Structures are given as structure tokens and as C-alpha cells.
Curated annotation (Swiss-Prot):
Signal peptide range: none
Coiled coil start-end: none
Subcellular location: Cytoplasm
Task of the protein: Specifically methylates the guanosine in position 1516 of 16S rRNA.
Entry EC no(s): 2.1.1.242
Family label: Belongs to the methyltransferase superfamily. RsmJ family.
The protein, known as: Ribosomal RNA small subunit methyltransferase J
Length: 279
């Protein structure tokens, strides 16, 4: 089930994007064009002879492309999509005991959980697999459409389809969505925050990602530049605390506390940690 709360693109500038496609995929490209247009994105269709690595290198600007695997974001010779199917090996290894995120979010209790910083949806995919009922909130129309496409593909996968009904995609601004829950006096068990730009450690040094800031994240940073508007984080914490019994914030291990607020509890891993705030 997908939900449009009407505020997904309210604060975003007008967007225009190319979709590159081979002629065999024209119908799919036209479908994505119509969907994106309904979400405020003007899309120019660009049929090409061959969508391959050479073409992507020669056309480095941020764009979309369509092939037999659906919709992709491309730039600088790379392309990416949330690709939930690629997460299957990780999911099959995961248990409530082995996953720190499961302990932090109490997934064994099958919570209703709002993921207010959707990203590529991989953490939500894991949490849904382990039993949570997920409300996955994303306001950027292109990223939301990529997530929607990944979920649609997952619904046809024998393994992933078993728990896709536990993931609800919501096209909305996370702050507005949390405010709406508060105004309607609705609560959830958990709000999960994984800000894309944690930036600084305790010594105010910029945090370096792993040598390969994943290809996916490189392209996401191009789509969602750190311009203040897209840097989801500090302002969501207080909103989340109003509607959830438990707020869990994922941070790089040495990052400063979100909004400089010390958590009530922490779970520490080698590369990241989970900070907990309780109501």
C-alpha cells in the first residue's frame, strides 16, 4: 500500500530530468515519465541506441535510465537503484539476536515503526523482514519513485514477497508527517532516524566514510545535496519524540549526538551505533 500525504515535494525546487532508454523499453519509460510528472518532475524522454557503460561515461550528468531491471539513477559513469533483491543474502543471515538494529528497535515485539529518513530502504527492508510494520517516508519524488519501483519488483520475488505487505511507502515530508501524527494524537512504537549527513565527530572533524562510499550513496548525495533542506536530522528528533515511545538514531560510531542530545541508551558496533531516546 502506498500513501500520498500531499506534501512530498512541497519544499523542493522544480525538477527536470532526462530518462534514457533503448527503444524496447519505450513503454516503461513513458510510464515512469507519467508517474514522475504527477509528482512534480518534468521528464524528457531520450531514446538511445545502446544503454551501456560507455554511454554512461559519455553522459555524466545526473539522469534516469530504464532497462530490463526497471528505473535507475545515473551520473558520472555509474547507475544505481535501491535494488532490494540484492539484499536477500543479508536478510537470510539476519536474526533478532544477530542484528543490533533488532535489539535497538525491539523488533521481536513486531513494532509499528516510522522510518523518517528512508534513503534506499535497506534498513526498513531488514526491519520488515524481522517483523516490524514499517511506514517508510520519503519526500523526494525521484527517490520515492525508485523505492516504489523496487517494492513493485520485490512483490514478484518468491522470498521478498512474503513480507512486502509490512512496508507502506508514504510520499511525504517527514517533518510534516510526524507533525500530522502529533496533531491527530496518533502514536507509533518506534521512529527510526538515519540522517544521511552526520558530518562531524566529537572533535568536530569531518567523518570519512569507508573507502568506497558506496556507489549508491555517491549518487544519492548528487540527488539530495547537503544544502540544509535535504540534511534531515536534528529537527526531526524532537518531532519524533512527540509521537513515539522509542526513537532510535543510527550514527557513525564516533559521530556527535543528533541535535547534541545525549541518548538514554546506546548500542555500539564496530562502525556504527544506535542511540535511543525514550518517551
Amino acid at each position: 500500500m502506498e500513501k500520498n500525504c500531499g506534501s512530498g515535494q512541497s519544499k523542493l525546487k522544480a525538477l527536470r530530468m532526462h530518462i534514457y532508454f533503448e527503444v524496447d523499453f519505450q513503454e516503461q519509460a513513458q510510464h515512469y515519465q507519467a508517474v514522475l510528472y504527477s509528482r512534480g518532475v518534468t521528464v524528457d524522454l531520450q531514446p538511445i541506441e545502446k544503454l551501456n557503460a560507455r554511454f554512461l561515461r559519455l553522459n555524466p550528468d545526473l539522469a534516469l535510465c530504464v532497462d530490463e531491471n526497471g528505473l535507475w539513477l545515473s551520473a558520472n559513469g555509474m547507475k544505481m537503484q535501491p535494488d532490494w533483491k540484492a539484499e536477500i543474502p543479508r536478510l537470510k543471515r539476519a536474526t533478532l539476536k544477530s542484528e543490533m538494529i533488532a535489539r535497538a528497535c525491539q523488533l521481536g515485539e513486531k513494532p509499528v515503526l516510522v522510518d523518517a529518513t528512508a534513503g534506499l530502504g535497506h534498513d526498513s527492508l531488514l526491519m520488515a523482514y524481522l517483523g516490524a510494520q514499517i511506514q517508510l517516508v520519503e519526500r523526494h519524488p525521484i527517490l520515492f519513485t525508485l523505492l516504489e519501483d523496487s517494492k513493485a519488483q520485490a512483490q514478484h520475488d518468491p522470498f521478498l514477497s512474503q513480507f512486502m505487505d509490512r512496508i507502506q511507502l508514504i510520499f511525504a515530508d517527514s517533518a510534516s508527517y510526524l507533525q500530522q501524527l502529533d496533531q491527530e494524537e496518533k502514536t507509533v512504537d518506534v521512529v527510526y532516524l538515519d540522517p544521511m549527513f552526520p558530518q562531524r565527530d566529537q572533535n568536530q572533524q569531518a567523518i570519512k566514510k569507508q573507502a568506497q562510499v558506496k556507489k549508491q550513496m555517491q549518487l544519492l548525495h548528487l540527488l539530495l545535496p547537503e544544502d540544509g533542506e535535504m540534511d534531515l536530522g536534528d529537527h526531526l528528533l524532537e518531532l519524533a519524540k512527540k509521537v513515539a515511545k522509542r526513537v532510535i538514531v543510527k550514527r557513525p560510531r564516533h559521530a556527535i549526538f543528533l541535535a547534541n542530545q545525549e541518548p538514554a541508551h546506546q548500542w555500539q558496533g564496530d562502525a556504527c551505533r544506535f542511540d535511543a531516546y525514550f518517551q
